[in-house]
Amino acid sequence: MVQLHNFFFFIIFMVVLCGTAAPVLLKWFVSRDVSTGAPFFNGTIIPILISLFSLLVYLHSRKIIRSMDGAKSGVLVRASRPILLPDIIGRSSSETRARKALFFFVPVLHFCLLESKGDFSYLESFCGVLCLLFFCTFFFLARDRSAKRERARRRKGQTLRPNGNEQRRNDKMRCSGHPHLDLERRVEGFGPLAFPVPPELGGACVGGVPPEIGLEALALPRSRQLMAMAVGHDYYQKVPMKMNISHGGVCICMLGVLLSNTKKIQFTQRLPLGYELHMGKERCCLRGLDHLHGPTFHSICGNLMIYKPSLTNDRLMFEHDESLHADLLLINFPASYKNGKLEHFLHWWMKNRKHNNFWLTMFPEKRYFRERTSTAEVAIHTNLFTDLYALIGTGSSRTGGWYTTIMKLPFIFFIWIGFMLASLGGLPSLLRQLQKDKLRWN
């Protein structure tokens, strides 16, 4: 079923990558525009998710049923009194207590940072903490050394030989006077266990167990091993690092999707030249319009400036550039155009150090073709935390301005990072499975 999981996540991440990264990459490298949006995602992800998710639930339920049926044939050591496992009643050391304290302190700190610095609600901060805990569990899973040794033995085709400590313990546990107890039989991953031998094979014993050999002499399975016996021997195994990376990428991708949808900000308003649009902490100003002419179209290119005013000065001043001092209306920027086309519709962040405010410029475009059709070219600004989308619609100076749409989507970059990590961890496993003659989908 691992192959089906990889195939499931691979399709989802490819669809998300095509819907988020492809427009930007194609615009940067080949200057080609592609249209993506809600129809693309709904028509691609929803049918695939419904079909594959139902199949995954069916296969997973079958695997659990088979594991539970196989566990009924396992042999457990019975006793007249309850046995307290040492893993449960053992006193925790200072290192264990420090690790538990750190495990509780990190989520609280993460919650406070998201709620205060990230300006998230309590529900969004709690969801972020859950994603963090889910991500950390894959790195704090205990390692089963016996399962690791058994896998190494299977790879090399050699017999598993006990080390010196285990050999001395086996010699002490060897019962020469009572052959009805076989203390040398081993169960995969559980160490030495006591299995009764029929009395006709040698000797008899009062009560079934000799008085000199008690339950303390038996190497009982630990709590993690009892869990493995309950659901199958292949349930508790060491999780490889590539699986940690893959699941961590899935968590980051889920966190990016959650935060980008809950913290989405969108404004659509008729904006005259020189007026500002308030978007929370940021402001958007329509500085001017430029007319462009292409081979088959003519277009109107908006000149938008998005900035965040400082706390000391509410107005943005451009003392470092004399051309941007007072009049912000109908200012042409010939350096931004080349051969009648927009060379760069994206300008990186710039900072006014004196007034401690940052600003950027965006150039959305409205194209009119000869076939009496029009398309809207979206201006996109991307950084590690926020994506800004600007779109200009119809309007004129006589009607009072142009309809302008500004959209702010935070943490879209987390989706990209999650996709890269999940692909990095799942690609080697997928390539290794494709080299086999027959794939085991279950």
Swiss-Prot record:
GO cellular component terms, A-Z: mitochondrial inner membrane
InterPro entries named in the record: CcmF_C (IPR032523), CCMFC (IPR044955)
Region: Disordered, residue numbers: 151-175
GO process terms (BP): cytochrome complex assembly
Pfam assignment, any one: CcmF_C
Biased composition (Basic and acidic residues): 166-175
Source organism, top-level taxon: Eukaryota
Keywords for the protein's UniProt record, in alphabetical order: Cytochrome c-type biogenesis, Membrane, Mitochondrion, Mitochondrion inner membrane, Transmembrane, Transmembrane helix, Transport
Topological category with respect to the lipid bilayer: Multi-pass membrane protein
Record has Transport as a keyword: yes
Subcellular location: Mitochondrion inner membrane
TM regions (residue ranges): 6-26, 39-59, 122-142, 411-431
Family affiliation: Belongs to the CcmF/CycK/Ccl1/NrfE/CcsA family.
Functional description taken from the UniProt entry: Forms a complex with CCMFN1, CCMFN2 and CCMH that performs the assembly of heme with c-type apocytochromes in mitochondria.
Miscellaneous section: A stretch of 270 kb of the mitochondrial genome is duplicated within the centromere of chromosome 2 resulting in the duplication of the gene. The expression of the duplicated gene (At2g07723) is not demonstrated. It is also probably not RNA edited and therefore differs in all the positions known to be edited.
PANTHER family xrefs: CYTOCHROME C BIOGENESIS CCMF C-TERMINAL-LIKE MITOCHONDRIAL PROTEIN-RELATED
Protein name, per record: Cytochrome c biogenesis CcmF C-terminal-like mitochondrial protein
Source organism of the structure: Arabidopsis thaliana
Lineage: Eukaryota, Viridiplantae, Streptophyta, Embryophyta, Tracheophyta
